[in-house]
């Protein structure tokens, strides 16, 4: 268990019927040939770049750069200075989302669209100016994952530690999964099932214990308007944007600290949660608590030293990231029926059939992780309604589903403990368990989060296991709208690349940490301009000085 400038719709992007198909071969438009790689590698700046990297980088990083730099050089080779990388989009490839990220291919006969890339964006992908947008562009078009250095690996461990402090895995879950007598699927479809279920469980923990970690959120960005979609998703050209929220804190509004607080004492003392009963009770509790409690959205940043980043673009991007999370969570919390639809489209955009029955072994596995949906499973077994209209209506209409049965478990499972807990479920069910069920329950959980969302946001900085500094700030809807529009304009090829301002401070601060430092034409021209400006200022100063006049 683990825990240019063409509009997008002009490229005939549709809801994918198939995704990431191995049978689709790349046309090679972005991939250099062996001969091209040899020529590129022989260019003096590239030899210099690789020599520099060999002095300070690890063997893994050197290998990484030797693969990435030639690919970028092939696409961005400057016509004015061929040894350097240009700072505009490659000719005919000016839509980063279509040309480098999603890379759709439409079958001219069937009209089916397949993707050689990823037909969605993440919140972090929207932060194109967190460092330098030109560097981001080169990385996007290289189609090579960002190098994972030791600090990133350490940060992931720290996130996992924080997650398990709040959401400790059941003590015997690994043993159960290893010894269960039926194979438990762990393919992408069933991984999504588990992810949605864990988000449900963790949001219950939020109201019970006052905090939750690693919560899914998502929304849709219009490739036509470059704005986020409000309400139902109606356009196949609306691009899925997903994120994972590091930390949600339920606290008293007038509190001077971030101490988590249960919504009510009754919830904090509850041990065995029945999800259906919990959801029936929760709306009234949220309404009563809305004046006194708030949910703060926070992001965790790990650092190798007890310092915060000096670069203002980095801090600003971190704030924007949390604002995105808060915005998406608020949107999901407006109306459960609309959110239900958005969740189903989310799954479809990933290539999944929302009516595909979930493997019964996975259901038993989820019940072992947390049994709060046991009552719901028994309702589906009997064919009873859940009490959520969109789901119940679809269940009544969908009569062509295959038989959903756990009868074979009666023969396969001999473990007495497992049989004692679950054998009443080993029958044929009237309603199959599909992604629709988890979408319905997760949508209702989001709806109860929305009313409590705070305008106060936070970034938590950790060094090791020490939370050494927090930055508190306010949600700014107008700024978020400006930034998201600007980012969408970039991703959908509706504006030019906007590198860092080429002043000496930026060129020294940002460029020295960049993989493209020695082959970047923007940096080269910026340094030349700064040098020329300095010489001109000296000339002007000397020309206007009294001593200069006397000499003349």
UniProtKB/Swiss-Prot annotation:
Co-factor requirement: Mg(2+); [4Fe-4S] cluster
Keyword DNA-binding appears in the UniProt entry: yes
Entry GO terms, CC: mitochondrion; nucleus
Protein name: Exonuclease V, mitochondrial
Subunit organization: Monomer.
Membrane-spanning intervals of the chain: none
Keywords: 4Fe-4S, DNA-binding, Exonuclease, Hydrolase, Iron, Iron-sulfur, Magnesium, Metal-binding, Mitochondrion, Nuclease, Transit peptide
Ligand binding ([4Fe-4S] cluster): 132, 511, 514, 520
A single MF term (Gene Ontology): single-stranded DNA 5'-3' DNA exonuclease activity
Entry keyword Zinc-finger: no
Coiled coil: none
InterPro entries assigned to the protein according to its UniProt record, in alphabetical order: EXOV
Subcellular compartments: Mitochondrion
Function: Single strand DNA specific 5'exonuclease involved in mitochondrial DNA replication and recombination. Releases dinucleotides as main products of catalysis. Has the capacity to slide across 5'double-stranded DNA or 5'RNA sequences and resumes cutting two nucleotides downstream of the double-stranded-to-single-stranded junction or RNA-to-DNA junction, respectively.
UniProt-listed Enzyme Commission number(s): 3.1.-.-
Free-text comment on the cofactor: Binds 1 [4Fe-4S] cluster.
Domain of life: Eukaryota
GO BP, one annotated term: interstrand cross-link repair
Biological source species: Lachancea thermotolerans (strain ATCC 56472 / CBS 6340 / NRRL Y-8284)
Main location (coarse class): mitochondrion
Family of this protein: Belongs to the EXO5 family.
């Amino acid at each position: 268990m683990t825990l240019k400038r063409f509009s997008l719709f002009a490229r005939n992007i549709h809801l994918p019927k198939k995704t990431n198909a191995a049978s689709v071969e790349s046309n090679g438009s972005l991939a250099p040939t062996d001969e091209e790689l040899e020529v590129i590698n022989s260019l003096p700046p590239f030899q210099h770049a690789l020599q520099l990297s060999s002095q300070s980088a690890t063997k893994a990083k050197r290998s990484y750069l030797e693969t990435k730099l030639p690919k970028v050089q092939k696409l961005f080779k400057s016509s004015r200075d061929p040894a350097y990388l240009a700072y505009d989009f490659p000719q005919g490839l000016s839509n980063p989302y279509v040309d480098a990220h999603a890379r759709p291919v439409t079958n001219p006969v069937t009209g089916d669209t397949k993707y050689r890339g990823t037909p969605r964006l993440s919140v972090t992908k929207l932060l194109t100016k967190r460092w330098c947008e030109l560097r981001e562009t080169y990385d996007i078009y290289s189609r090579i994952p960002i190098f994972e250095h030791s600090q990133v690996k350490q940060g992931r461990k720290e996130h996992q530690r924080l997650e398990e402090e709040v959401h400790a895995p059941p003590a015997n879950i690994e043993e159960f999964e290893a010894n269960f007598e039926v194979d438990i699927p762990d393919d992408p479809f069933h991984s999504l099932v588990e992810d949605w279920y864990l988000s449900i469980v963790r949001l219950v923990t939020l109201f019970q214990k006052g905090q939750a970690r690693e919560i899914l959120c998502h929304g849709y960005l219009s490739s036509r308007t470059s704005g986020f979609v409000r309400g139902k998703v109606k356009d196949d050209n609306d691009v899925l944007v997903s994120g994972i929220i590091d930390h949600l804190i339920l606290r008293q509004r007038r509190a001077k600290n971030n101490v988590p607080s249960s919504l009510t004492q009754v919830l904090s003392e509850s041990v065995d949660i029945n999800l259906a009963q919990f959801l029936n009770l929760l709306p009234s509790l949220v309404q009563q608590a809305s004046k006194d409690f708030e949910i703060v959205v926070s992001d965790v940043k790990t650092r190798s030293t007890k310092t915060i980043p000096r670069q203002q673009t980095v801090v600003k991007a971190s704030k924007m990231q949390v604002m995105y999370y808060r915005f998406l969570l608020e949107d999901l919390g407006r109306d459960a029926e609309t959110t239900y639809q958005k969740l189903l489209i989310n799954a479809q955009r990933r290539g999944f059939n929302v009516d595909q029955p979930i493997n019964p072994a996975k259901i038993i596995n989820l019940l072992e992780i947390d049994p709060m949906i046991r009552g719901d499973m028994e309702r589906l077994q009997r064919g009873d309604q859940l009490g959520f209209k969109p789901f119940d209506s679809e269940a009544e209409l969908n009569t062509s589903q295959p038989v959903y049965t756990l009868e074979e478990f009666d023969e396969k499972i001999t473990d007495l403990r497992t049989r004692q807990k679950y054998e009443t479920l080993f029958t044929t069910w009237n309603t199959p368990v599909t992604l629709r069920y988890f979408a319905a329950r997760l949508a209702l959980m989001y709806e109860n989060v929305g009313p409590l969302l705070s305008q106060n946001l936070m970034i938590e900085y950790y060094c090791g296991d020490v939370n050494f500094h927090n930055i508190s700030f306010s949600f700014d809807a107008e700024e978020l709208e400006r930034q998201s529009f600007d980012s969408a304009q970039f991703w959908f090829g509706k504006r030019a690349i906007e590198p860092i301002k080429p002043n000496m401070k930026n060129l020294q601060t940002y460029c020295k940490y960049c993989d493209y430092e020695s082959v970047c034409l923007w940096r080269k021209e910026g340094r030349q301009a700064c040098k020329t400006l300095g010489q001109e200022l000296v000339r002007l100063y000397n020309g206007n000085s009294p001593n200069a006049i006397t000499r003349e």
